[in-house]
Amino acid sequence: DLARQGFDVEVLERASSPGGKMREVKVGESYIDAGPTVFTMKWVFESLFHDAGSKLEEFLELQTASILARHAWRNDSHAGSRLDLFADIEQNAAAIADFAGGREANGYRAFCKRGADIYQTLRDTYMAAQRPSPFELVQRVGFGNLGAMWRTAPMKTLWAELGNYFHDPRLRQLFGRYATYVGSSPQFAPATLMLIAHVEQEGVWIVKGGMRRVADALQQLGEKHGARFRFNTHVDEIQIAQGRVEGVRLAGGEILAFDAVVFNGDISALGTGLLGAPVTKAAKPIARKDRSLSAVTWCVSAKTRGFPLHHHNVFFAEDYLEEFDAVFRRRTITSAPTVYVCAQDRADAAVDQHIERDSDRMLVLINAPADGDVSSLSEVQIAALQENAFVVMRQCGLEIDASTMSSVATPPEGFNALFPATGGALYGRANHGSMASFARPGATSGIRGLYLAGGSVHPGAGIPMATISGRLAAQRFIADLGF
């Protein structure tokens, strides 16, 4: 947005390539997506590319996911149960009726209508707009439309509200998992997050070549309009003079003068002084107790059997709330975690699930507390966690052949090293409580010329949300210039 409007833009990135959390890890001879794996809200990217005089499809090849996600449970009373979710509501209702009965299918239809209503209320007033106060949000929605505002259900928890739609505990688990999309527990996250179901019904896409191609496309679009990118470039300090930004000092001592800086990192790095004492007032660091989920991940290359993998797969144990109590209260990892698997080469379930492969490239993920700055996991502990995760998958039918497996693990302390001052939190602040969405800072900081973007600021975590945050920062900068 800034480069296409004639501003001189330089992007300084401490990593060797663009993308941040949207990274790849080399395992053997393969590269595996190791960060966000779900591509939704395509309109956000279409709008960005359109405004820059280009088309998204000129830079990215996207395939509509035939199945949004495949879910399986190990619970003894439901051994071998499996449910696929599709973008079409009636197709899902039919699948849910077969899976859990007609009452649950009717509950699902009502749940979808509620999620769509919430999304329509908040899309343009909150998600795609500058951060409002609670009162400003009510103003945007309209005082004559307070009923719609009330139906966004910020005072209710997602877990409690799901109980009004679903009696089958497996469905409550499945839709409660949407809280983890913003790094939170369904027991404490607001029911407003029901809108995520509608986001997925609008479409999930698979990016040909892997999610890193999204970052590559954004770099190419920026360069097309004159933006310059410098990688392996560590900023030691954002320099301030007379209350406003004047530039940055790099790790090697080089000083670069800028009229403005957009900081696209976790706000805790500012608040803890990692970019210099003068900018600590720009944003308060997120307290450890308020951090979102971290994870232990394994990028795996191995032969699999026994389970028809789709691109997105979720394997559930039976006690979902125990998992979040362990992470958020006891600061540990349950022995029977929910396991997410992104099978990167399984793009079309109708074809791929029946193909015998020599090897699958997979991201395997379990939730963990964001304590990577105060504790670390030993190799023995990581191996035990891997075995626990593999047991859950095995009991759901998926066998990973250890004799063919190569893997690279990343625990919370690894994520903290990649994203300093986070403790390994992957989504900024946990979205717990009715006011959590207003606790994130907006595009402006407490320092003139310093703007904020990324998953720890408004409108929140996720690839499309982080993209929106960058556009809001550019918008605010231009507005501050009086344009």
What function would you assign to each model-found segment?
Residues 77-188:
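Rossmann-like flavin
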Residues 168-182, 334-340, 399-459:
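A glycine-rich dinucleotide-binding beta-alpha-beta segment and adjacent secondary-structure elements
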